[in-house]
């Protein structure tokens, strides 16, 4: 909960007293002027400051060499935090820890960091995760939030990498080699030298502190370097065999002390060790070799290291790292070597390991399943992408060229030129973000994106050809925005695969996380949104995690990015209003309680508008791209222009996302007043539809919280904005900036309370007051909320209205022998899918579900006495083909459904009898 300030200052009291009374009729009561004041609101000077300060706090500041003005700000922050009841629970007693956190907040806000983060940790004896868990409970500025996020991401990556290095060294080096070696060189020394060398290389090569993949590839290069320097007697297989051709026969370290110069060229050119490492860790050998030759070797040559026992001197390496550490003023990663408690994490909440369940059946074959570490997870994800793209090309296939040739205007040359031009821009931007030495890495990523781009484009065109029986897609394939969006989506899949940005919150990703790709391609978020659904449907091999990632990108666009001032969305809305008028605007006439039909194609979205406003009795549907082009061309000749498919679908999805979030918040805050949810939703939906300018450069959740607060006020429900904000912070996608920094007017930002009072309530005052009258407005329909508009390939499929679940057992991904794959069944999975082996396959279960659901729907409609519309597809039961071997007969008056149901019942009876007979036979044999 954000901290409160119980004692108002004189200035605040005067401001409150000076507020003019609201004219009648009274507007919704506004929030108390006492707000969540951040650290920037605290005064820098205070009378008799030293007298109020505790001696231990002063001593802590002296140890950290804190300037006076930072110390004063930190103490005032402490007073503010400690005055709030229940916010930090029992932690208030641990003053030293909270003092340190307050010092950190003040130092970041004032840009006066006179200490390193590790120094602060050591002085208050606190771990990284505990520090940040406490900090999250305190209301801090965006500046502090960003600093905290950067440090935590860096820590998470370093923790994962050190854990990986430690385990890998155990697999490479002998812990107890012969006595002649152990006195001068051992595995502990190699680990220490390798880790510090890696830290130096990472700091030099990478500008991004939280890139996990390139960092791990760099770590493999470090391992390769020191394996080659190590005596073979110190190594385990297969490294011992691989290193002998380089180092010669096993020798004592004293005889090999001066061999570094002799094998310098071999270190640069021999790749046998790096190939073994890549095979063991299932890394792409070409990518690692690129990092090795382009980045690592030049870095090592620039160090000019002095060696001892064939290894660089630890003191020399440590001194070089000390300079980087003091400059960055953050974590001293050398402490990982000592397993320092400030860098350890709780074993239960460990970021580093999430182990898979053990097999319960001891008779089953035991597969050794490695722990799912961050490195292993991202490597598996990359390998899955490679499996998809192995057969793909970074040039258009023959099928694609055939489609190009069938176009009225051949798009081939423009497509190739666009791909080439964007490639230069992408590599430049990638190197700027990651490091200037990483241009070639950017080129490799771009080539993967281009492969996926051509692959998905071909899949889209094939699907359209099968659906429409046409091959001329000239208008779509000559649309620049379509190609830019499709290429951007392919590149986003690649970038997300190589990063950890597939987390729940996109803001917690790396510098290359979405919407980075939009900035690189200078693409509007609303245009990018149009391709997401078609992309997912066209590429059936996307992993569940990647589909979820693209869905989160879609949510990010719908909640804020599509509402930026320069977005084409506002022009589209204005055109829609001008054409159709306020009564037929957007989705006002569309039933929101119906499921969202995902049958929109790229042509629908990018050649929109593609359909005329429907007239009564009209059943015409524009499906073909050719028709779409004709419709778009003739739009200017009709009296009433065409509707926009892309805008219509966008608003449907926005409404569903908005209601889902509102529903979650209402369940947490208004469980005792469930009737208010529908009213709040009506105001919320009205604002999005009719006052959409309030969304310009703002966030969907800001309108949601204001709608909730306004309705609660007119309904006399005591719900403070602070309570709403506190509950909102617990939502998985929430970031504090959403309620701390809201646009008030051009280039002026303030808290959400100020936005409500000065903007939202002023615009919607009349509408809000209607809900307090005896004749409130008609309530808006509640949107139908599906679990997800996209089907995940590995998810159990639940058919609405039925009780049978079908779980696909096959996956296109097979990692490698010895590793778990989705195709390997466990005893648990066998039980889930084997429901009567003689009955049939999952397709039969699907048919049963279809039959039951359709028949239930028909019976229900018949009972209501209505004439239901004809279904798109009829269930046809072939009576002549029925199985009467069991002697079942059908009465003349029976419906087809009743006949089929009787057959199913009979079949099940036969199965049960067969099982009973089998059981009796088995028991008889045992008795004999």
From Swiss-Prot:
The modification Phosphoserine is found at residues 37, 249, 567, 608, 612, 624, 780, 788, 795, 807, 811, 855. InterPro entries: Cyclin-like_dom, Cyclin-like_sf, RB_A, RB_B, RB_C, RB_fam, RB_N. One of its GO terms (cellular component) is chromatin. GO terms for molecular function: disordered domain specific binding; DNA-binding transcription factor binding; identical protein binding; importin-alpha family protein binding; kinase binding; molecular adaptor activity; phosphoprotein binding; RNA polymerase II transcription regulatory region sequence-specific DNA binding. Keywords: Acetylation, Cell cycle, Chromatin regulator, Cytoplasm, Disease variant, DNA-binding, Host-virus interaction, Methylation, Nucleus, Phosphoprotein, Repressor, Transcription, Transcription regulation, Tumor suppressor. Residues 619-632 have a biased composition (Polar residues). Residues 8-19 have a biased composition (Low complexity). A motif (Bipartite nuclear localization signal) lies at residues 860-876. The hypophosphorylated form interacts with and sequesters the E2F1 transcription factor, thereby inhibiting E2F1 transcription. Interacts with heterodimeric E2F/DP transcription factor complexes containing TFDP1 and either E2F1, E2F3, E2F4 or E2F5, or TFDP2 and E2F4. Interacts (when hyperphosphorylated and hypophosphorylated) with PKP3; the interaction inhibits RB1 interaction with and repression of the transcription factor E2F1, potentially via sequestering RB1 to the cytoplasm. The unphosphorylated form interacts with EID1, ARID3B, KDM5A, SUV39H1, MJD2A/JHDM3A and THOC1. (Microbial infection) Interacts with adenovirus E1A protein. This is Retinoblastoma-associated protein. The gene is RB1.
């Amino acid at each position: 909960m954000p901290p409160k300030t119980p004692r108002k200052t004189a200035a605040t009291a005067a401001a409150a007293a000076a507020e003019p009374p609201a004219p009648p009729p009274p507007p919704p009561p506004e929030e108390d002027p006492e707000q969540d004041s951040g650290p920037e609101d605290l005064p820098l000077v205070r009378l008799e400051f030293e007298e109020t300060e505790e001696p231990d706090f002063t001593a802590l500041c002296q140890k950290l060499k804190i300037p006076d003005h930072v110390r004063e700000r930190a103490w005032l922050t402490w007073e503010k935090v400690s005055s709030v009841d229940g916010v930090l629970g029992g932690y208030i007693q641990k003053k030293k820890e909270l003092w340190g956190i307050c010092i950190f907040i003040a130092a970041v806000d004032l840009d006066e960091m006179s200490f390193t983060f590790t120094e602060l940790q050591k002085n208050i004896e606190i771990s990284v995760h505990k520090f940040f868990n406490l900090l999250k409970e305190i209301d801090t500025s965006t500046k502090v939030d960003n600093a905290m996020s950067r440090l935590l991401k860096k820590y998470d990556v370093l923790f994962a990498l050190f854990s990986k290095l430690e385990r890998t060294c155990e697999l490479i080096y002998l812990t107890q080699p012969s006595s002649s070696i152990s006195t001068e060189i051992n595995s502990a020394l190699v680990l220490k030298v390798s880790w510090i060398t890696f830290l130096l290389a990472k700091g030099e090569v990478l500008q991004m502190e939280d890139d996990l993949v390139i960092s791990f590839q760099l770590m493999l290069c470090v391992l390769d370097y020191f394996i080659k320097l190590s005596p073979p007697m110190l190594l385990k297989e297969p490294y011992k065999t691989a290193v002998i051709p380089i180092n010669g026969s096993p020798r004592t370290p004293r005889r090999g002390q001066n061999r570094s110069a002799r094998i310098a060229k071999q270190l640069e050119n021999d790749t046998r060790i790096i190939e073994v490492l890549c095979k063991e860790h299932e890394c792409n050998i070409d990518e690692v070799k690129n990092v090795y030759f382009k980045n690592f070797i030049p870095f090592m040559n620039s160090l000019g290291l002095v060696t001892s026992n064939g290894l660089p001197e630890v003191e020399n390496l440590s001194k070089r790292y000390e300079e980087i550490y003091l400059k960055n003023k953050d974590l001293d990663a050398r402490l990982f070597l000592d397993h320092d408690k400030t860098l350890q994490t709780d074993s239960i909440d460990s970021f580093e390991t999430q182990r898979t369940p053990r097999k319960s059946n001891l008779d089953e074959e035991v597969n050794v399943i490695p722990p799912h570490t961050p490195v292993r997870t991202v490597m598996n994800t990359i390998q899955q992408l490679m499996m998809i793209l192995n057969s793909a090309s970074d040039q258009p296939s023959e099928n694609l060229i055939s489609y190009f040739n069938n176009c009225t205007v051949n798009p081939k040359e423009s497509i190739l030129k666009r791909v080439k031009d964007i490639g230069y821009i992408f590599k430049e931007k990638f190197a700027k973000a990651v490091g200037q030495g990483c241009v070639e890495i950017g080129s490799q990523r771009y080539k993967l994106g281009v492969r996926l781009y051509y692959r998905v484009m071909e899949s889209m065109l094939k699907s359209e050809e099968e659906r429409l029986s046409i091959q001329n897609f000239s208008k779509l394939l000559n649309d620049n925005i379509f190609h830019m969006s499709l290429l951007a989506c392919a590149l986003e899949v690649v970038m997300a695969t190589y990063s950890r940005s597939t987390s729940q919150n996109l803001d917690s990703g790396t510098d290359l996380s979405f919407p980075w790709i939009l900035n690189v391609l200078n693409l509007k978020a609303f245009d990018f949104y149009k391709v997401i659904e078609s992309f997912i449907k066209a590429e059936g091999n996307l992993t569940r995690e990647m589909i979820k990632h693209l869905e989160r990108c879609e949510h990010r666009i719908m909640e804020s990015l599509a509402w930026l001032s320069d977005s084409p969305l506002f022009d589209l809305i204005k055109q829609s209003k001008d054409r159709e008028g306020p009564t037929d605007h957007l989705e006002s006439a569309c039933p929101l309680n119906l499921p969202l039909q995902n049958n929109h194609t790229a042509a629908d979205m990018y050649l929109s508008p593609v359909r005329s406003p429907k007239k009564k009795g009209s059943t015409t549907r524009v499906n073909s791209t050719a028709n779409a082009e004709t419709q778009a061309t003739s739009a200017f000749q009709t009296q009433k222009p065409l509707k926009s498919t892309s805008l219509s679908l966008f608003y449907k999805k926005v409404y569903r996302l908005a209601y889902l979030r509102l529903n979650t918040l209402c369940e947490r805050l208004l469980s005792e007043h469930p009737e208010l949810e529908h009213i709040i939703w009506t105001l919320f939906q009205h604002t999005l539809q009719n006052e959409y300018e309030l969304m310009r450069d703002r966030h969907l959740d800001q309108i949601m919280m204001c709608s909730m607060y306004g309705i609660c006020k007119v309904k006399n429900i005591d719900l403070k904005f602070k309570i709403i904000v506190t509950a909102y912070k617990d939502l998985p996608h929430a970031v504090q900036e959403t309620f701390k920094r809201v646009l008030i007017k051009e280039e002026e930002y303030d808290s959400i309370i100020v936005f409500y009072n000065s903007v939202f309530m002023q615009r919607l005052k009349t509408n809000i007051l209607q809900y307090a009258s005896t004749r409130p407005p008609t309530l808006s329909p509640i949107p139908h909320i599906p679990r997800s508009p996209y089907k995940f390939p590995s998810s159990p499929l639940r058919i609405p209205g039925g009780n049978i679940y079908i779980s696909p057992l096959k996956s296109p991904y097979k990692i490698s022998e010895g590793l778990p794959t989705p195709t390997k069944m466990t005893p648990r999975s066998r039980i889930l899918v084997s429901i009567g082996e003689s009955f049939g396959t999952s397709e039969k279960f699907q048919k049963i579900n279809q039959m039951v659901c359709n028949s239930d729907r028909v019976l229900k409609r018949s009972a209501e006495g209505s004439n239901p519309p004809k279904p798109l597809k009829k269930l046809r039961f072939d009576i002549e083909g029925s199985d009467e071997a069991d002697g079942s007969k059908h009465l003349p008056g029976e419906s087809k459904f009743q006949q089929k149901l009787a057959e199913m019942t009979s079949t099940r009876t036969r199965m049960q009898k067969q099982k009973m007979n089998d059981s009796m036979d088995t028991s008889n044999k045992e008795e004999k």
